[in-house]
Amino acid sequence: MKIDIFDTTLRDGFQQEGISPSVKDKLEIAKLLDNLGVSFIEGGWPGASPKEEEFFKKAKSELNLANAKLVSFGSTRKLSLSADKDPQVQALLDADTEYVCIVGKSSKLHITKAIQATVCLLYTSPSPRDLVISRMPSSA
């Protein structure tokens, strides 16, 4: 049995007030996580800040990961924009990572009340690409 570790230190781990690692720090931490054998390293949210964009640019040329795959993190498109017009979706594409983690509203309450959209379930057959979809329930 193989267990894949999906590490969120470079994004979620730095959300505490007063913690703001440099791009160099994030690159070094990514190397350490790779050396530990972590399977996936969530690098951050490209488009959230120029520093995040710089991290992904430098990671492309400076990180030679032996074990891990770098993952960019972002959200679904804004309800009022098509995906090709949404700057967040474009930032995910510009990060040029092999893997992307996309967070989106999945509870009926969030969909109908928070973003005031309708619930639509779409079932698809497996795609020819390796697409993994997992759902983690929110606390609300």
Predicted regions, residues:
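Conserved small/polar residues in nucleotide/adenosyl-binding loops
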Residues: 123-128
